[in-house]
Design a protein with these regions (language model features):
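N-terminal-proximal low-complexity accessory segments that begin disordered
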Residues: 1-52, 57
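Short, glycine/acidic-rich hinge or "gate" loops at secondary-structure transitions
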Residues: 238-244, 259-262, 437-439, 467-483
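Contiguous, non-catalytic segments that form substrate-binding/exosite surfaces or channel walls
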Residues: 80-204, 208-406, 412
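Post-HEXXH active-site segment of zinc metalloproteases
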Residues: 431-451
Length: 570
């Protein structure tokens, strides 16, 4: 499963089992949707930073056409840098958000660029190779320029200090005021304002540049639409055909009302074996959590494994009723939480190559409340992770003792998958906003708190006797494997992705740290969880698993979707 390793990355392969069981028409549909997915790659690069595409193309030209000695450390280090750019869809780390530091000299790159045929370089009109270097080198080599893709540091202007390309010439205050003025507190079905546009200031006037056919990114979007039209012609049924048709309409109009109509049609299509996401979806890449990055996933249902998630979703009301949060924050009637295990046929955009293993959509609160949501666990990706991790020495190195290791070996894969199922299927779908509460009230903290809420819901229930009763886990000990690995990862091992001295910026990583630290600190008087030194190494030790579950429940109370307390979240 492992292809290669460089920097802090390991590249894995994944299998696409059961593809051959699809009908010829279904395979054709997967092919067209896959082509549509491939066309959006450059959108994401540009969203992540305005110079990313030109830096990538300049480096690709050198990588492909360099005539000098390729065995030098300069060339080899440039190759690693380029691979990191490919992996992170830009010049910033996909988790840490900090800019990559090139381990090759400016002189080397400049000589290489100036020695190239100018037609191979991404030159602007009338630009020389020398001017290209003058424009792009400071962005690459000066640590003070565009140092962070998404900055979440409290008290700073998050828009001006973030290198992502969602705003141009606009301050955080201006952006928040612009979208604040659009919102009507009485509107119970609001569109996701600002989701599919760049906010710019031109001639002193703030305006949106919409991503659509004829707007920004039209070259890529026209190609996406071309393949979607082909997919529409081989749809499995009328419902799916309507979904694809409405998505095409959204790409052509850029209207967020069309986007909501598409999302409602999509969430109601439960009969198709093949499903897909294609478009501006998640807002983690915007420090204000407003604008969505482009992503795509084409998949088909894993019929056998879906049985597990169907048991969970059919008991969704029981889980909602028995959660430890206040009754006023619970849904009286849980609407259509559909859950399935899927096989990914392709990952693209912001889902590639570092991908989610579980997804719950749509994101609009009112659509979830009125029409339900779709929750998926990506089975073949989880399987690749599990297969690559077995026997790599990680647990032998970091897990405190043999008893914990044996438990993780025995139950870890199963409880990990169950936690993902519970996180997506019930966690994101649980709870409700009280009337009049702005879903964006938590601003920059919204993404992290929402992820924490979903994780805590899953953690709280993975230890519930109900799971033994439903035959989802073999016994009452299994949950301890997930608790141990979650706490070890949150407190310690996930930090391998962060450079010393830097802060954790990515929402999912922040949430894991938040939960693990909460349990560690709140449980400290009773030594519920400890960090213990043994032979000069630090280990996580869990002394009281039942108390850990209680603390997860307490933390869940603080992250429930109402009343949206920003100082508490901070």
């Amino acid at each position: 499963y492992t292809v290669e390793q460089f920097a802090d990355l390991q590249i894995l392969r994944y299998k696409v089992p059961e593809f051959e069981t699809l009908t010829l028409k279904q395979k054709e549909l997967v092919y067209y949707l896959t082509q549509a997915a491939l066309e959006g790659r450059d959108i994401l690069f540009d969203q992540n930073g305005k110079y990313n595409l030109r830096i990538r193309r300049m480096l690709e030209a050198v990588y492909t056409h360099y005539q000098g000695d390729k065995s030098t450390s300069d060339f080899k280090n440039m190759e690693v840098y380029l691979k990191r750019v490919w992996f992170s869809n830009g010049i910033h780390h996909h988790y840490g958000m900090e800019k990559f530091v090139p381990d090759f000299s400016q002189d080397f790159l400049k000589k290489a660029v100036l020695g190239m045929d100018a037609q191979l370089l991404p030159l602007a009109e009338g630009q020389t190779a020398e001017q290209l270097c003058d424009e792009l080198f400071p962005v690459m080599f000066d640590p003070a320029i565009m140092s962070k893709r998404v900055n979440q540091a409290d008290g700073e202007d998050l828009v001006l200090t973030s290198a992502c390309n969602y705003y141009d010439g606009v301050t955080q205050q201006e952006a928040e005021s612009f979208y604040g003025a659009m919102k009507d507190p009485k509107d119970e079905t609001p569109v996701s304002y600002g989701l599919n546009s760049r906010l710019v200031k031109e001639d002193g006037k703030i305006q949106e540049k919409v991503w659509k056919v004829g707007g920004l990114y039209t070259q890529a979007i026209e190609k996406i639409v071309y393949w979607l039209k082909k997919a529409e012609s081989v749809a499995e049924n009328d419902a799916q055909k309507a979904v694809i048709g409405k998505l095409i309409q959204f790409y052509e109009t850029g209207s967020l009302k069309d986007f909501d109509e598409y999302a409602i049609l999509w969430v109601k299509d439960l009969d198709s074996r093949i499903d897909f996401v294609n478009g501006f979806t998640e807002s983690y890449g915007d420090p204000l959590g407003v604008k969505a990055s482009w992503e795509s996933l084409v998949n088909f249902k894993d019929l056998e494994a879906t049985h597990r998630t169907e048991i969970i979703s059919s008991n969704a009301q029981w889980f909602e009723d028995h959660s430890p949060v206040d009754k006023s924050f619970k849904k009286e009637k849980v609407k259509g939480v559909s859950a399935k295990v899927i096989t990914a046929a392709i990952l693209a955009g912001d889902l590639y190559p570092a991908t989610a293993i579980g997804i719950n959509l749509p994101n609009a609160n009112w659509i979830r409340a009125h029409h339900g949501s779709k929750s998926v666990t990506i089975g073949n990706i989880t399987d690749a992770y599990n297969k690559a991790a077995h026997g790599n020495g990680f647990n032998e190195e970091f897990v405190y003792n043999d008893e914990e290791r044996q438990r993780i070996d025995q139950y870890g894969d199963l409880t990990g998958e169950l936690h993902t199922d519970l996180h997506e299927c019930l966690g994101h779908g649980s709870g409700k906003l009280l009337p009049g509460v702005d879903p964006d009230a938590l601003k920059a903290y919204g993404s992290t708190i929402e992820e924490a809420r979903a994780d805590l819901f899953g953690l709280y229930y993975v230890a519930d006797p109900k799971l033994v009763e439903l035959k989802l886990v073999p016994d009452a000990e299994a949950y301890k494997a997930e608790y141990y690995t979650f706490l070890m990862n949150g407190l310690m091992t996930q930090l391998v992705r962060i450079e010393p001295g830097n802060n954790i910026e990515e929402a999912h990583m922040r949430n894991r740290q938040l939960i693990a630290r909460w349990v560690f600190e709140k449980g400290a008087p009773d030594k519920v969880v400890e960090m213990v030194k043994k032979d000069g190494k630090t280990y996580v030790v869990v002394n009281d698993y039942e108390k850990v579950r209680e603390l997860f429940g307490d933390c869940l109370l603080y992250t429930s979707p109402s009343p949206r307390d920003i100082s508490g979240s901070r």
